[in-house]
Amino acid sequence: MGTKELHIVMYPWLAFGHFIPYLHLSNKLAQKGHKITFLLPHRAKLQLDSQNLYPSLITLVPITVPQVDTLPLGAESTADIPLSQHGDLSIAMDRTRPEIESILSKLDPKPDLIFFDMAQWVPVIASKLGIKSVSYNIVCAISLDLVRDWYKKDDGSNVPSWTLKHDKSSHFGENISILERALIALGTPDAIGIRSCREIEGEYCDSIAERFKKPVLLSGTTLPEPSDDPLDPKWVKWLGKFEEGSVIFCCLGSQHVLDKPQLQELALGLEMTGLPFFLAIKPPLGYATLDEVLPEGFSERVRDRGVAHGGWVQQPQMLAHPSVGCFLCHCGSSSMWEALVSDTQLVLFPQIPDQALNAVLMADKLKVGVKVEREDDGGVSKEVWSRAIKSVMDKESEIAAEVKKNHTKWRDMLINEEFVNGYIDSFIKDLQDLVEK
């Protein structure tokens, strides 16, 4: 059994949706006495310094993201670009390889392990330096296990046709597709790590281990402790006007932006429910504010019970407020886990293939929420939005009762302190054993 204090390097994909879960894991590992060297762009370091809870053990090391001609000047992460340019950002990430190798070769003490996700070349340089590599994935095991088969069904059989616009062959770097990159990243390291637990995704984890012939190490959800930062007083005051569990909180993430017609249907669907709601969503591309695209007369009609906010909101704090009773989410992996540990009814609106698979897990396997049904072109009418929300918010609804019962069961398990600590302790032991092999 391993007992070694580890030195682990973290190099996640250049996105805050990856930096932050990697930092949450780093805090959990440092809490147990392990040393972390975390590689990330300069501006991201400045933004995340305050979330480093163990600065004596976690060192955030800034790296330079090389300029790519097709990207805006100074782009360092997905926060600086639209979704359509993520493939070009991966070119920039690949061009960090010489700097990453140089840093790894000079670190003292020498690292035992390096965690990565999208930089599929990491195992090559790690092996050369005598460092074990772990493909640590914040996406769910169901996505890792099934996404290849999902993409293979090019005729659209058994998959929603709206997902087919996300092309498996689209470039994600120079002369490499996103699918090729993912398969190399999973097939070449010493182990595969996943932010998940066996109770929820055991069958998919076993399938991944068999498919890639690699040990699969599970860290648990590694969600942070509840934040000491209070919810913005403005929103506390607004939410305080409504009954417990009555407010719909809709937050669809920053990766995919609805177009104007779809955003209007969503807004009208929220209005049709008759319930108070908080819509946090970015304006469509080409528009500076939500006011430019909301339906005519909408703001006036809902002024006493609805907020449409185009900026950032504190999602965990919003979900923890007692007035919030429904979470309409996009099923990104982090939001999925935050949803599962919340005490809200769940409505699921995935927007890209891995989110769609997460929604399958949530709605079909765990039965903790309902999916919003799309047309073949991906569209959703206001009536469908309203119907999905009402199905989980109507106190007389059998669906509402079922998803609440199932959600409570899984939530109670996931927030159990012994359960959480057991996973991180087992994960560390597995890493120690891997290093000592």
Curated annotation (Swiss-Prot):
EC number: 2.4.1.-
Uses described in the biotechnology field: Soapwort saponins possess anticancer properties and are also being explored as enhancers for endosomal escape in targeted tumor therapies. They may also serve as precursors for vaccine adjuvants.
Enzyme class: transferase
Keywords: Glycosyltransferase, Transferase
Sequence positions that bind UDP: S254, W312, V313, H330, S335, E338
One BP term from GO: glycosylation
A Pfam short name: UDPGT
Active-site annotation: H18, D117
Function, in words: Component of the oleanane-type triterpene saponins (e.g. saponarioside A and saponarioside B) biosynthetic pathway, leading to the production of natural products with detergent properties used as traditional sources of soap.
Protein's name in the database: UDP-glucosyl transferase 79L3
Organism from which the protein derives: Saponaria officinalis (Common soapwort)
Lineage of producing organism: Eukaryota, Viridiplantae, Streptophyta, Embryophyta, Tracheophyta
